[in-house]
Amino acid sequence: FKVNQQIGGGTWVYLGTFTFDKGRNDYGMVVLSNESKEKGVVCADAVRFGGGMGNIARGGQTSGLPRYLEGARYSAQWAGMPYSVYGGYEGKNDMNDDINVRSRTVNYLAGKSLFNPTEEGLGIPFEMSMALHSDAGFSKEDEIIGTLGIYTTNFNNGKLHAGTDRHASRDLSDILLTQLQRDIRSTFNVDWTRRSLWNRNYSETRLPAVPSTIVELLSHQNFADMRLGHDPNFKFTVGRALYKAILQYICSQHGKDYVVQPLPVSHFAIRFGQKKNTLELSWQGEEDPLEPTAKPREYIVYTRIGRGGFDNGVRVSSPSHTVKIEPGIVYSFKVTAVNRGGESFPSEILAAYKAKREKGQILIVNGFDRISGPAVIDTPDAAGFDLSQDPGVPYLYDISLCGAQQNFSRKEAGRRLGESSDEYEGMKIIGNTFDYPFVHGKAIQAAGNYSFVSCSDEAVEKGILSLEDYPIVDYILGLEKEDNSSNPARNTYYKTFSSPMQRILTSYCQSGGHLLVSGAYVGSDMDSSQGNKEFIQNILKYRHGNSLKTDGDKIAVRGLGHTFTLPRLPNEQSYPVTSPDCILPMSPAFPVMTYAIGNTPAAVAYQGNDYRTFVMGFPFESIREETSRNAIMASILRFLTTDYTD
């Protein structure tokens, strides 16, 4: 890391997120070293791990929430800002201080820099300020409210602190709204509304020393807006649009061309290499149809050994990489694309393992790509989001959920419609971590003497890997399902078994393969057409019974000599399985697991002379206890491989 110690003193400098072993140990430390070819010393007043819990007391009590969920006024105090920045109302009106402290913090951090030369401060060259808000307002006709931009010109004789005309704030606001509307309309094929540009007197656009704007992205009070707003795909599009707009603005101020960071790579796959104890990684760079400059030029491959953290990565010029490995250790990999503009979001995480005494190879296919908002209620009388049916799938995690919606009455629009409880406040709710080949792989490792590699389902569908090369295939489906109701404008396809995958799995089974499938919607997602039903009934040997409905925070499952549980409610350890599928065997298949409630089949096995299948109506990785996962995987592998003819 490069840290300029001549600016920004007296406050925290974020270095990154790192993995440490739990508890106290000899390696749980940060070492400060002065070893360098250059003159000078490295110094730090303090090192902080994590953001911590709120500790600014009011009325003798703290909030009890993580600091990142508290207001800006408390954050600024803990970050080392002077009292004049955060205490204008002397502790008597935290709300007003919270509004003003955002701008005053920017001014203090940028003080004595080129962009705020007239104020004292830390010299950090902030060039602009953007406040991202949601707005009020509602439509009883389910029309989108859309985005509003706000700026202020009538202050300080129309000048900013560096002498720049305050109309620069209008330019910034215009660029942001234009990019947002263009990208949302193009990505989701929805008529997203650009409301207007307001030249008004707001603290966050009046006080900053630099060009500033408020972006009122959408209405949190309006069902049509929030139907999009809850979708992580929408959040990514919005975030990328704002980033691109800010980049355009700053580069235009300096007369420079801009380059946008690439999109994440796709079609990621791992094979065993031609040389002994090697792995061959391959992937595909993605073009951005909305941004011609976002072309990948190079890639960074990150490696994780066992349960450790990822390394700093290896830069490669082509979409492939060969890695030497040591038998007996599980390796995990993720890939990013890079160009002059920066680094993309990471790929899904794939894992591989070479057994010391190999008796077979397994291919793990990751088909769990879904990220989604919660289930939707949309009737003439009711509107909202039903967390009890499906709380959605956050990208990695979600910190914004307060609780389940309580009021669904459309008659209450603009008043109590959308009112929620607070049981999830302060929770970091786990979503799709894109790291489940590792969970499956560790269970395979524990079963003994099986090697494995993994790949994305896109790589299989494109023919990059052939299932027939592997005697056993483990197909991860997690919470994958086709879901148009939560966001009807979504253009992403999350089918459990796509048409190409159905053909590939049919061919694999008919060639004598051994297939493990697990997912919460392997039955219900295949009820939409006769062709889908025939595939699961004739090839995978099961049919959909119903979706399990139950109360409580966990679901008990029995089978293969074990009883284990699945999480049913949002939590901080693993994604919830709200209503897994009950699947019924098609003769001569038979049930091998049951849900404790109702004693309905949870898993079905088929042992034919031609091929074998083991299908679970819940995700394997959602089994809470690792010992249970290991035991269940060992039993499944025995079933798939044992010769029962003797």
Regions inferred by a protein language model and the residue ranges of each:
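Active-site-adjacent mobile loop/cap segments within catalytic or ligand-binding domains
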Residues: 33-35, 46-54, 113, 131-158, ...
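Active-site microenvironments of hydrolase-like enzyme catalytic domains
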Residues: 71-170, 198-221
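Aromatic-Pro/Gly-enriched surface loop or interdomain linker
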Residues: 59, 348-472, 476-479, 634-644
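A glycine-centered loop/beta-turn motif at secondary-structure junctions
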Residues: 207-220, 241, 470, 510-518, ...
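Short beta-strand-plus-loop segments that form exposed binding edges in beta-rich domains
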Residues: 30-40
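Short alpha-beta junction capping motif
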Residues: 357-368, 375-387, 463-529, 607, ...
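Pro/Thr/Ser/Gly-rich low-complexity, intrinsically disordered linker/stalk tracts
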Residues: 249-293, 327, 342-360
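A glycine-rich, often tryptophan-bearing local segment used as a flexible ligand/cofactor-contacting loop or short
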Residues: 479-593, 597, 632
